[in-house]
């Protein structure tokens, strides 16, 4: 049966806590069933953590929400069990073009090299993303999804948080060891705790028009500065599934947000871009302003903030939803270890410090893009236009031209969870401690596969690079003790092309194109330790069990 995800609704059910409050707190309650709350709840449930997901509505998001989902987000969705659905429905793209007036200034490719399983970006309406995530969540038994459940009270205690949850059947109390607030930019959780975000609001207005049409434009991101069809402003064009195109028109601060949403104002703007004879339908129209801001602290006792309620950015660069999903990715494994008693609660402080750093990076990039796109003085405008004119011929100017630095994952190089490289161990690659693991083509069990899915499962992973001089069986004996750690480490052995074999209890992958060794700057004996969120936390030129144990303790605040 075909599902209309744009109008998807979920059934409200009376919560058992109405009649008999749980005898002990739930391990985790999550407030907000957008992409961030859904991703966090799925991640926890896949690891066996009993979780309650609360949302004050019974629908998915509609209208002009997020549409650009980055490669790293897609890799996280793969781990959550719904990446393929996103790719199949979404519009994949790697290439963008920047124009000044009628002239092409430059073209960029966000994924110029081969050997990656996912594209740089897909465009996919947020209601599809939420729908696919919700359907995945409903498959997981440890997860309860409670719709039309509005949190109206929060009380923190020494060992739990008590929420007052308002439903069509009245109000009931819900206790949880930890609460994740993922209820968006207008967060009720933030207000209930008397907290706020701080930052900068930009004095400009933008019109978003989601237009249904058949158009000859390629599947690329096109951005115009001062185009002839919309003088002295900017325009962004993106393709979405179902023959829908997202068009963003800069309007200026003095534009009337109510009047500009009217069809008689929107249609002429769209026709100026497409041509007077163009046939199209307006699917959604909105006018927005935006801010770059964040909370001072993402953790407040047993309440942890993630996504838009913790930080907000302008839409230039697609850093909002993508950074929120990365919040979920960072938080879930830490919550699991803490509620299971395998790590102290101080591990959750590293969620705050790492993701506050990432938020600052996103806000900086978003602010710079906005300042370039919307110059606030004649001098700034002259600088911008001169930069764009130079960018046609000069590579250095292209690095300065900024139509939105598109989302990339944060490299947590200063994280306290990282183990510094051993003195004398020299690496020449991007896989430094704190970096997210990069993908590469491999073969597993005599079939084509990818590296990243071999690191799924919610555990730490040790990647050992085996040479031709000693077989995987010898390597496996060296790694045998890892499974006996207090937190077991899953061993993964990478062998050169043509050396594939089977070792009981160990995943052996064949580096068929040599890309794994190249991207990790690996030699025989090189060993990498990955966190459950696939970030590198340590690496060595030679495996040493005691060093791995120490790094594991450091990465879980057990040192």
Regions found by a protein language model. Name each.
Residues 45-65:
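Glycine-rich FAD pyrophosphate-binding loop
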Residues 88, 104, 134-135, 160, ...:
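Conserved FAD-binding catalytic core of PHBH/FMO-like flavoproteins
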Residues 1-31, 46-47, 100-103, 131, ...:
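Helical substrate-recognition/capping region of FAD-dependent monooxygenase/halogenase enzymes
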Residues 10, 241-243, 257-323, 343, ...:
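FAD/FMN-dependent oxidoreductases across multiple families
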Residues 24, 169-178:
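Core beta-strand elements of the Rossmann-like FAD/NAD(P) dinucleotide-binding domain
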Residues 62-138:
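Active-site-adjacent segment of FAD-dependent monooxygenases/related oxidoreductases
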Residues 33-34, 126:
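Glycine-rich Rossmann-fold phosphate-binding loop(s) that bind the pyrophosphate
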Residues 147-161:
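A conserved short coil-to-beta-strand element within the FAD-binding core of flavoproteins
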């Amino acid at each position: 049966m075909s599902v209309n995800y744009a109008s998807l609704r979920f059934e409200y059910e009376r919560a058992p806590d109405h009649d008999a409050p749980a005898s002990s707190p739930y391990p985790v309650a999550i407030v907000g069933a957008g992409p961030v709350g859904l991703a966090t709840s799925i991640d926890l449930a896949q690891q066996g953590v009993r979780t309650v997901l609360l949302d004050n509505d019974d629908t998915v998001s509609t209208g002009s929400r997020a549409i650009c989902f980055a490669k790293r987000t897609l890799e996280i969705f793969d781990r959550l069990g719904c990446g393929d659905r996103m790719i199949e429905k979404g519009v994949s793209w790697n290439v963008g073009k920047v124009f000044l007036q009628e002239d092409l200034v430059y073209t960029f490719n966000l994924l110029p090299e081969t050997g990656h399983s996912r594209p740089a970006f897909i465009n996919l309406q947020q209601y599809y993303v939420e729908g696919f995530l919700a359907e995945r969540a409903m498959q997981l038994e440890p997860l309860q999804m409670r719709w039309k459940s509005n949190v109206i009270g929060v009380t923190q205690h020494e060992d739990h948080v008590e929420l007052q949850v308002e439903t069509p059947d009245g109000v009931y109390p819900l206790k949880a060891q930890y609460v994740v607030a993922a209820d968006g930019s207008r967060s009720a959780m933030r207000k209930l705790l008397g907290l706020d975000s701080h930052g900068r609001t930009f004095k400009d207005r933008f019109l978003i028009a989601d237009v249904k049409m058949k158009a000859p434009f390629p599947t690329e991101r096109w951005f115009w500065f001062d185009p002839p069809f919309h003088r002295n402003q900017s325009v962004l064009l993106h393709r979405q599934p179902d023959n829908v195109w997202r068009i963003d028109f800069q309007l200026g601060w003095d534009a009337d947000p109510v009047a500009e949403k009217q069809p008689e104002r929107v249609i002429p703007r769209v026709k100026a871009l497409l041509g007077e004879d163009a046939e199209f339908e307006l699917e959604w129209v909105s006018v927005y302003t935006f801010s770059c801001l964040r909370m001072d602290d993402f953790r407040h006792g047993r309440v942890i903030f993630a996504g838009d309620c913790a930080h907000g950015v302008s839409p230039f660069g697609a850093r909002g939803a993508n950074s929120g999903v990365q919040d979920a990715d960072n938080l879930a494994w830490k919550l699991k270890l803490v509620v299971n008693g395998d790590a102290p609660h101080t591990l959750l402080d590293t969620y705050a410090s790492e993701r506050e750093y990432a938020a600052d990076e996103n806000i900086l990039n978003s602010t710079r893009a906005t300042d370039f796109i919307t110059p606030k003085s004649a001098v700034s405008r002259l600088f911008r236009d001169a930069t764009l004119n130079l960018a046609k011929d000069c590579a250095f100017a292209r690095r300065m031209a900024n139509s939105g630095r598109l989302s990339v994952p944060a490299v947590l190089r200063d994280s306290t969870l990282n183990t510094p490289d051993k003195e004398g161990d020299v690496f020449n690659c991007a896989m430094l401690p704190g970096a997210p693991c990069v993908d590469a083509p491999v073969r597993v069990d005599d079939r084509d596969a990818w590296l990243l899915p071999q690191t799924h499962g919610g555990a730490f992973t040790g990647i050992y690079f085996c040479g031709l001089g000693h077989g995987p069986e010898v390597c496996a004996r060296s790694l045998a003790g890892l499974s006996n750690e207090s937190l077991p480490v899953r061993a993964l052995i990478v062998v050169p092309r043509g050396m594939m074999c089977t070792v009981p209890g160990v995943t052996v992958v064949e580096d068929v194109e040599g890309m794994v060794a190249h991207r990790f700057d690996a030699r025989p004996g090189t060993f990498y330790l990955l966190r459950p969120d696939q970030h590198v936390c340590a690496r060595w030129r030679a495996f040493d069990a005691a060093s791995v144990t120490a790094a594991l303790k450091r990465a879980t605040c057990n040192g």
